[in-house]
Design a protein with these regions (language model features):
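Transmembrane beta-strands of outer-membrane beta-barrel pores
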Residues: 50-54, 84-88, 151-157, 170-172, ...
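Residue-level signature of outer-membrane beta-barrel architecture
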Residues: 70-72, 139, 170-172, 242, ...
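Residues that define the transmembrane beta-barrel architecture of outer-membrane proteins
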Residues: 60-64, 127-133, 160-164, 230-236, ...
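Outer-membrane beta-barrel proteins
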Residues: 57-59, 79, 89-93, 158-162, ...
Length: 440
């Protein structure tokens, strides 16, 4: 997952920014386009960042980003970005905590891991490296009309994503109003080590019942599908950006997304419990093979005498019955000596997918779809942080960001039989985010 957002494209050589310039830069940020340099002779603008993300006893991520933008004249702009990130640590398997020791087979089928009584089952060998490349070209097509097209490539150990995009932006009323439309197509393939699990197949665990290693491997691979699977995604975006006055800018977006293909997480399982809440088996999850989402987004930027206020709200709904609300706010205060501070607060809340179940009951019939992944369950989350940036004597910009993130899964209404009532089934996920960025 991308942990670093693209840096705002601003003219780093400016020692001060008046209100009109601030609104112009904000317009570019809202449209997702690079800001236009005052003079194409200034050459390339480079943004770099290094980010650390660390969860308590879970995932740790390091991410490096290099982004480059160049105006070749007459607003013919190229922008590119290279992202490399590495993730290690422990990832939740979806199984439920138990009052006794639990044994799990690793997703590859090679080896096992043990979970202590009362602990959330985590696979502590989670490790992955991702390389992502993006390129975008933007240019005027005629007066007040701009076109943009781009490509996206992301590669992990077992996952490949390719995407293309295109968009148009039309200005009206002396560029005070902009209408935009964008379309993208993505093709993803997944080929996990050990194969893709058969839906609701029971996890094969070697407890000494197999006479030979070959017998175990035969049982394991009987629950697997060999070869890769894929998913396609089409995204449509409609946008309206309006300059309200010399201080205020507002944007409205509507987005539609349709994905078809393999949506199941091959690394997630569900616990099957008896009436006492004790685990009887572990089954691999199964999700629907298509998903449609609608997104509604509003953002306002207000240029103050000594800074910029930024507030946004997003509502998302899909046919998995996941509804989410996101409020994001940033308040930048300009300080003496060409520096600034920017507090940040973000709140997120979502409902559970219709097929989300924290566990299955052995007395119930098997559902068509089910997942115990907390990421499709009911939850709330918040981020609280602070960024400090400064413009150096040579016009370059250096910034530091430190944030605290907490995610709180919730029980969406399932009864907890027997021993589960004495266990922590929905632990919070807490993380620290630290970033340093340098632009020149």
């Amino acid at each position: 997952m991308q942990l670093i957002k693209g840096q705002k494209k601003q003219n780093r050589r400016a020692k001060a920014m008046n209100i009109n310039t601030a609104l112009a830069a904000a317009t570019c940020a809202l449209l997702g386009a690079p800001a236009i340099a005052d003079n194409s002779d200034e050459g390339w603008q480079i943004d770099t960042a290094l980010l650390y993300y660390g969860e308590s006893d879970r995932v740790t991520a390091l991410e490096a980003v290099v982004a480059a933008t160049k105006d070749f004249g007459d607003e013919h702009i190229f922008s590119g970005k290279l992202i490399i990130d590495s993730l290690t640590g422990a990832s939740a398997s979806g199984a439920i905590a138990q009052p006794s020791v639990q044994t799990f087979t690793r997703p590859s089928g090679k080896g096992q891991y043990i979970i202590a009584p009362g602990d959330t089952p985590l696979d502590d060998t989670f490790k992955d490296t991702r390389i992502q490349f993006e390129a975008q070209w933007t240019q005027p097509l005629r007066e007040d009309l701009r076109g943009s097209t781009g490509i996206h490539l992301s590669n992990e150990y077992d996952y490949l994503s390719l995407a293309i995009n295109g968009s148009l932006a039309q200005d009206f009323k002396q560029k005070n109003t902009t209408l935009s439309v964008g379309l993208s197509y993505a093709y993803d393939t997944i080929d996990p080590e050990g194969g893709r699990p058969v839906s609701f197949a029971e996890m094969v665990i070697d407890r000494g019942q197999f006479a030979t290693e070959a017998a175990y491997e035969a049982a394991f691979y009987a629950t697997r599908q060999q070869g890769s699977d894929d998913k396609t995604t089409i995204d449509l975006l409609l946008g309206l950006t309006q300059i309200i006055n010399r201080r205020m800018l507002m944007q409205f977006n509507y987005g539609y997304s349709r994905s078809d293909g393999y949506h199941t997480d091959p690394f997630k399982v569900l616990s099957v419990l008896n009436n006492q809440g004790l685990s009887q088996a572990l089954l691999h999850e199964n999700r629907p093979d298509q998903r449609s989402k609608h997104n509604f987004y509003w953002q306002t930027k207000y240029a103050m005498d000594n800074g910029v206020a930024d507030l946004s709200y997003r509502f998302s709904t899909d046919d998995w019955e996941i509804d989410s609300h996101t409020i994001d706010s940033r308040l930048r205060f300009n300080l003496p000596n060409a520096s600034y501070i920017q507090p940040h607060f973000r709140y997120y809340q979502q409902s559970a997918a219709e097929f989300y179940q924290p566990f299955l009951r052995d007395s119930d019939s098997m559902p068509q779809y089910a997942s115990a992944d907390y990421r499709v369950g009911e939850m709330s989350a918040y981020t609280l942080g602070l960024k400090y940036g400064m413009t150096l004597d040579n016009g370059d910009e250096l910034a530091f960001r430190l944030e605290y993130y907490q995610q709180d899964p919730k029980n969406p209404g399932f009864s907890e039989p027997g021993v589960l009532q004495d266990l922590q089934l929905y632990p919070s996920v807490k993380a620290i985010i630290a970033q340093v960025s340098y632009s020149f």
